[in-house]
Structures are given as structure tokens and as C-alpha cells.
């Protein structure tokens, strides 16, 4: 029998200290990592329920374990809400992550050695889009497209040329660091020219898609994948969506279970269902609109201060800051901002002369700061602080400026708490 009065703090003070310290960090630091966000207390609560105890291999109504009648209800709700939210005919809510969702799609639609055409990691793609260090670049013959060096935009002519040359089995559209709107239909047309499947990875913009602020790829692509966190603001996890195609649906289900996973995480699936319901509210659309407004305000301020943004600005929630030619690297900028309690991530930029461990850029995103209540005024102020640190790095007197900015960050964070007590 469990002791219901027992607390984590009393039983495991080391873990409790880690949890508390991370909570403080989230409250006292400004989070600008584009893939991070703060989930609602409801989403967090669902993940701490007794659903975590239940094994449920299989799918609703067709399980390999007994006693699944109630977790079936949770998963069925998650599936129907996902389909409604994104206009999909099919949804699989079991993938544990976006990468595992992508892995399942590769397994369902391609065979080892098949050619896959995806966006280069160095130009804003994702590891699972064919990077050599990833399964997608090891098991499959990965061909990579990128950005036009003059415009900083996806070079659709290059995509078409590569598709005609290599005849891929699947084309992957999507990104982890691209600030403009992708033309899903152009990708569809190119895929149709060569008889390829089209997979869209909308992990970064799923929240914007749900709110109607970014084109919806679900009825254009053969298969669409996403994370359920990032802009969508749900629990950490993945999802697969598709338009009606019974053959592909069967392949996708088999690729997730038993192909790649065993028991689904029912407590996380319940949290996904809650986040999908949250995404159907008017307040959620207001939030996503503010995410884009904040990103545009930050990009404009960077440009005004003489800092280059890849692609010349942003039409979504993120931007890639190009530091090529600066005496400091992306790693230097990341570390300096971290000392001021501003969290970003170093990121390679197109034609980056530095190594992936150093880089010449940083990626900046607005989902988390918008969740805590920042609007354009705070974002402009914050961007100017970042530019002040950049200028100080260039001048060689960063320490004093970092301390000044750190004090201002502390004040701003107190004004905009993430989780008010």
C-alpha cells in the first residue's frame, strides 16, 4: 500500500531539488528556444494521473491486453479531436515524439535504400529529414535541398531539379529553422511529377496551422507529422495525420505498433487530447496571433540594429540570426545570453564556415515568451537587450552589459510569471 502522505521532497530530496531548480529557472529566465513552450496546468495534471499505470498495446477496440475500456475512451477522444483540429481523415496519437512519428512514416512508405529528398539540416531542415548522422541518412539514400543563397528562401527550382534527377520514393517538406511560409502545393506538384510520396513535417508550425495562421498541409500531403509540444503547446509527444487512404492508414498503424513501439503512453495521450481541446478555443487563436506579432517585432528590431536575419524576416514564430562575419560565434552568443538569463540555441546558418558545435547563428522563437504574456513592446525591449550584448561582445566589454541585462531580465520575469502561485 502506498503512503499518500509521502512527498517527493521528503522521499527523494535530490530529485525534488532538481525539479524545484528547473521550475525556478523557467520563471527567472526568458525562454527563446523556438521549439520550447510552457504547457497548461491541465496538460501537466493529465500526465500525473493513474493512466500511467495502464498497458494498452494495440489500438482502441483492438488491444492485446484486457482492462483497456477506459484508456480506449481517452485515445478515441484524442484521435477525433486531432482529426477535427487539423481537418484530417486519419490520426495516430501514439508516437512518443516527432522523430518517432517520422521514423514510422519512413518505415511505412519506404524501404531501406530508397531515395528520400529532404531539407538540409544546415539550411534549416531537421535531423530526420536525411541528415547523415540520423537513421534517415543511414538507412535511406538521402538527397538534400536547401535555400537560395541570394534570397534565403527555399529553392523550389532546385527541389524540382533534384527530384527529376534522383526520382525519390518520398519528398519531405518541413523545417526546424526556417522563418517563411512553405508552399505545400508546389511540393505536391513536384512529388506528383516523379511519382513520389509527400510527407510534411509541420512540428514547428502545428499551433499556427491549428489557429488558421499558416497553410494547412494535411489534405495536400500524403502524410503529415508533428510534435504535440512546440507551438501546439501540448505534452511532449508526436502525432501522424493523413487524408483518406486505407492502404496508407494500415501501413502507418503497423509502422507505429508493432513496428516501432510497444505500449503507448496513455497518460500522455490524455494530455494530448486536452491540448487539442485547448487549441479549439478563441483564446488559443489570440495566442497564436500574438506569437507571430511578437516574432515579427523581434525580427524587425534585429534588422534595425544591423543584425541579419536569414530569409530577411519572419512569417511564423521563429527567426534564424546570421552572425557570419562577426568576431563572435553562435556558441559565444548563446553562452553570453545564457549568462544574462536569456535562453537561445546556437544554430548553423546557410554556408556556415564554422563547425556545427560552434556555428555562426542563433535560433530565436516566441512561443514561450508569448505564453507568459509578452507583447510587442516587451519583445522589442528584449531584442534591444540582445543586440546590446552582441555589440558588447564585439567591443570586448560584454561582462558589464550582461550584468545590466540580467538585472532587467529579472525584473521583466517577475512582471510576467509563467505559473502564477
UniProtKB/Swiss-Prot annotation:
Gene Ontology BP terms: glycine biosynthetic process from serine; tetrahydrofolate interconversion
Keyword Transferase: yes
Site (Plays an important role in substrate specificity): 229
Species per Swiss-Prot/TrEMBL record: Cellvibrio japonicus (strain Ueda107) (Pseudomonas fluorescens subsp. cellulosa)
Record keywords: Amino-acid biosynthesis, Cytoplasm, One-carbon metabolism, Pyridoxal phosphate, Transferase
The keyword Cytoplasm is annotated on this UniProt entry: yes
EC number of the protein: 2.1.2.1
Disulfide bond annotation, renumbered to this chain: none
GO cellular component term of the entry, any: cytosol
Stored Pfam families: SHMT
Classification via InterPro entries: PyrdxlP-dep_Trfase, PyrdxlP-dep_Trfase_major, PyrdxlP-dep_Trfase_small, Ser_HO-MeTrfase, Ser_HO-MeTrfase-like, Ser_HO-MeTrfase_PLP_BS, SHMT-like_dom
Family affiliation: Belongs to the SHMT family.
Protein name: Serine hydroxymethyltransferase
Gene3D superfamilies referenced in this protein's UniProt entry, alphabetically: Aspartate Aminotransferase, domain 1, Type I PLP-dependent aspartate aminotransferase-like (Major domain)
Lineage, opening ranks: Bacteria, Pseudomonadati, Pseudomonadota, Gammaproteobacteria, Cellvibrionales
Binding locations of (6S)-5,6,7,8-tetrahydrofolate: 121, 125-127, 355-357
Chief localisation class: cytoplasm
Location in or out of the cell: Cytoplasm
First-tier enzyme category under EC: transferase
Cofactor or coenzyme needed: pyridoxal 5'-phosphate
Gene of this entry: glyA
Entries under PROSITE patterns matching the protein: SHMT
Residue positions, PTM N6-(pyridoxal phosphate)lysine: 230
HAMAP family from the UniProt entry: SHMT
Assembly description: Homodimer.
Amino acid at each position: 500500500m502506498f503512503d499518500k502522505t509521502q512527498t517527493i521532497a521528503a522521499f527523494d530530496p535530490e530529485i525534488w531539488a532538481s525539479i524545484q531548480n528547473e521550475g525556478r529557472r523557467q520563471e527567472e529566465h526568458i525562454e527563446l528556444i523556438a521549439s520550447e513552450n510552457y504547457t497548461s496546468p491541465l496538460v501537466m495534471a493529465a500526465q500525473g494521473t493513474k493512466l500511467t499505470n495502464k498497458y494498452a498495446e494495440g489500438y482502441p477496440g483492438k488491444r492485446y491486453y484486457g482492462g483497456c475500456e477506459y484508456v480506449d475512451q481517452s485515445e478515441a477522444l484524442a484521435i477525433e479531436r486531432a482529426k477535427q483540429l487539423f481537418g484530417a481523415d486519419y490520426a495516430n496519437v501514439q508516437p512518443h515524439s516527432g522523430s518517432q512519428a517520422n521514423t514510422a512514416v519512413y518505415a511505412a512508405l519506404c524501404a531501406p535504400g530508397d531515395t528520400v529528398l529532404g531539407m538540409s539540416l544546415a539550411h534549416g531542415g531537421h535531423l530526420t529529414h536525411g541528415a547523415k548522422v540520423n537513421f534517415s541518412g543511414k538507412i535511406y539514400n538521402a538527397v538534400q535541398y536547401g535555400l537560395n543563397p541570394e534570397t534565403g528562401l527555399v529553392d523550389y527550382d532546385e527541389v524540382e531539379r533534384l527530384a527529376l534527377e534522383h526520382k525519390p520514393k518520398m519528398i519531405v517538406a518541413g523545417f526546424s529553422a526556417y522563418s517563411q511560409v512553405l508552399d505545400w502545393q508546389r511540393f505536391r506538384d513536384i512529388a506528383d511529377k516523379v511519382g513520389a510520396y509527400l510527407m510534411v513535417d509541420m512540428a514547428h508550425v502545428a499551433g499556427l496551422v491549428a489557429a488558421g495562421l499558416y497553410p494547412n498541409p494535411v489534405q495536400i500531403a500524403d502524410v503529415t507529422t508533428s510534435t504535440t509540444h512546440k507551438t501546439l503547446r501540448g505534452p511532449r509527444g508526436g502525432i501522424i495525420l493523413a487524408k483518406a487512404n486505407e492502404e496508407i492508414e494500415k501501413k502507418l498503424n503497423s509502422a507505429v505498433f508493432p513496428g516501432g513501439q510497444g505500449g503507448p503512453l496513455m497518460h500522455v495521450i490524455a494530455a494530448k487530447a486536452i491540448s487539442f481541446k485547448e487549441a479549439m478555443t478563441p483564446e488559443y487563436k489570440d495566442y497564436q496571433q500574438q506569437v507571430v506579432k511578437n516574432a515579427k517585432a523581434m525580427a524587425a528590431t534585429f534588422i534595425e540594429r544591423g543584425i541579419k536575419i536569414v530569409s530577411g524576416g519572419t512569417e511564423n514564430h521563429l527567426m534564424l540570426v546570421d552572425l557570419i562575419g562577426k568576431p563572435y560565434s553562435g556558441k559565444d552568443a548563446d553562452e553570453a545570453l545564457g549568462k544574462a538569463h536569456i535562453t537561445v540555441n546556437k544554430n548553423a546558418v546557410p554556408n556556415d564556415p564554422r563547425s556545427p558545435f560552434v556555428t555562426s547563428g542563433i535560433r530565436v522563437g516566441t512561443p514561450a515568451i508569448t505564453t507568459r504574456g509578452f507583447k510587442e513592446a516587451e519583445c522589442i525591449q528584449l531584442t534591444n537587450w540582445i543586440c546590446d550584448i552582441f555589440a558588447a561582445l564585439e567591443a570586448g566589454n560584454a561582462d558589464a552589459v550582461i550584468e545590466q541585462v540580467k538585472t532587467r531580465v529579472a525584473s521583466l520575469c517577475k512582471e510576467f510569471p509563467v505559473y502564477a502561485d
